[in-house]
Regions:
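N-terminal maturation segment of proteins
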Residues: 1-552
Length: 552
């Protein structure tokens, strides 16, 4: 983890995770041993923070261990990106390594530059480890949907061409970062890319093409070996609950109906009275002044508009938090190879030492997917007071707590952060922005519907796209990236609304219990200071805050 790879741990910045079958087996042994130690640890006499840390680690390790018992896929330890497919359009070292080297790997001196090269030299082995696991999964009958493989093959083909000619995304970051450091860094990096990484990528591409020859357009896990079992685990990992697909599907339907009623009020006030809510929302987004130009000028304006929204909310944050984080943030275009299969944006905090800022990675491949309706909500979710903001509080916790994360908390907080932006008045006099906020909430409600529809009810990709577009009013290009993401990460999309709903329910209970003693700043601080936790642990943290507030 960058930011802690100093001193005795400095060697970490030269290495990469072992993604081979042996690496997975080693992680399983670690999880088994660590979980046993945690369960044997007495809780009596420990302070609440330590008890919480033990509960968090035990939950993360138990879920990951259960995931590694499944015959295929990626089961992360305290992270959100669990997937049945080791390599796909948004998963794999072919994407992770370039992004990490570009966005997070520090290059301040010769030692840092050598560490970059060491990681580059380790990349081929990481790629080959993934290829072996992908081949093993194919032998068990697991093949991704054809439409995901088409995106992956196209993106990897472009990456190989770039890496073979100039070094592409593997070399460019080092050439830029080491420009003032004496040494032949870029030529050395290009040689590594050309002689080791490109051949490994070609081997991985050959495996993907072998899978494509067997692939069908079946989108969900229901048609795949042990798919229902994998999806049940994916939902548990993604929501930190045992809620069933049917329950989550119904929850999404009810939430969507409420949000569409609110959207209808805005659209009617704007003179849009004919057609469905989604059709009218689409029409509103086509009005002059809502979109951005094509090409680089549009990309520049999009980034500037996003930055403007971040700048505007900062002065209002003291109304929602007792203690302000730094909010160390920059907006960056995501790697080009990633854009075709990626969402509109995603974000996260920087390094623990603060030297590398948090990022909102924005998809600028097609500027038309962004407009002045959708951007404000997007940056509050990904940036401040969403993922980047929350992540900085987590980094103040003990190291194990800053590393472990739970999808339902992370995404639930970011969705709640969108609500905070509304409550802080960010949409006053801005019907376009408030419509986008409601569209964003509807989008997350639809995720419950579509994710469970694909993986539990046997929906096709076309059925999922039709449901998504009809419900949200988002452009079809956005919908395709979203639906394809749900196909690649079963269960992950359900954590957003489940997490938000739990935070809001806990807030309502705190208000009812505390009455005049309730203060939004204290509630939000309790949710953040308790760290990234499973939802049952979050409920306990909030209960302790309420008890303390009543006692005072």
């Amino acid at each position: 983890m960058l930011g802690v790879d100093t001193g005795a741990r400095a060697g970490l910045r030269r290495s990469l995770e072992d993604r081979s079958p042996a690496g997975v087996a080693a992680r399983r042994r670690f999880l088994t041993e660590a979980l046993g130690q945690l369960r044997r640890q007495p809780r009596t006499g420990l302070d609440p923070a330590t008890v919480t840390s033990l509960a968090v680690a035990e939950s993360a390790f138990r879920t990951a261990l259960d995931g590694t018992a499944l015959p295929y896929g990626v089961a992360t330890i305290g992270d959100w990106r669990n997937t049945p497919y080791v390599v796909i359009q948004n998963v794999g070292a072919w994407l992770d390594v370039p992004q990490m080297l570009d966005g997070d790997q520090p290059v301040r001196d010769r030692a840092d530059a050598e560490a970059y090269l060491a990681r580059l030299a380790a990349t081929a082995a990481q790629l080959d480890g993934e290829t072996v696991r992908s081949r093993q999964a194919r032998a068990q009958g697991l093949v991704p949907p054809s439409f995901l493989l088409d995106k992956t093959i196209a993106g990897m083909t472009r990456t190989i061409a770039e890496a073979a000619s100039t070094g592409g995304p593997f070399v460019g970051p080092l050439a830029r970062k080491a420009a003032t450091i004496q040494g032949d860094w870029a030529p050395r990096a290009a040689a590594i890319a050309r002689t080791t990484i490109v051949p490994a990528l070609q081997r991985q591409l050959a495996e993907l093409r072998a899978q494509r020859a067997l692939a069908t357009d079946a989108a969900g896990m229901g048609t795949r070996p042990r798919g229902a079992e994998w999806y049940a685990w994916g939902l548990r990992a993604g929501t930190t609950t045992r809620r069933t697909p049917a329950d989550l599907h119904a929850m999404g339907r009810a939430r969507l109906a409420d949000l569409q009623a609110q959207m209808d009020v805005i659209l009617r006030a704007e003179g849009l009275t004919q057609g469905t809510v989604a059709e009218r929302a689409i029409a509103f987004q086509k009005r002059p002044g809502i979109g951005f130009p094509d090409g680089d000028e549009g990309r520049r304006q999009i980034v500037a508009y996003m930055q403007g929204r971040i700048d505007a909310i900062r002065p209002r944050l003291p109304r929602a938090f007792r203690r302000l984080a730094r909010g160390n943030l920059e907006i960056r275009r995501m790697p080009l190879a990633q854009e075709p299969g990626a969402p509109a944006a995603y974000g996260g905090p920087g390094t623990i030492d603060g030297r590398v800022p948090g990022k909102v990675w924005v998809n600028l491949g097609d500027p038309s997917i962004h407009n002045r309706v959708t951007i404000p909500d997007l940056v509050y979710h990904e940036g401040i007071p969403g993922h980047v903001w929350q992540g900085e509080y987590a980094q103040a916790l003990p190291l194990i707590r800053s590393i472990l994360a739970f999808n339902a908390y992370s995404e639930g907080w970011a969705l709640y952060a969108e609500q905070l932006a509304d409550e802080l008045g960010m949409y006053e006099g801005d019907p376009a922005g408030r419509l986008g906020y409601l569209m964003g909430l509807a989008w997350r409600a639809v995720r419950l519907i579509v994710d469970t529809g694909i993986h539990s009810m046997g929906w096709s990709r076309d059925r999922a796209l039709a449901e998504f577009v009809a419900a949200t009013g988002l452009p079809r290009s956005n919908a395709e990236s979203e639906v394809d993401r749900y196909c690649a990460w079963p269960g992950q999309a359900c954590g957003y609304e489940v997490g938000r709903a739990e935070i809001v329910a806990l807030r309502s209970r705190a208000q009812a219990t505390l009455g005049r003693r309730y203060d939004l700043r204290d509630f939000d601080q309790a949710v953040l200071d308790g760290g990234n936790v499973p939802l049952d642990v979050l409920a306990g943290n909030v209960s302790r805050y309420v008890e303390g507030a009543r006692a005072s």
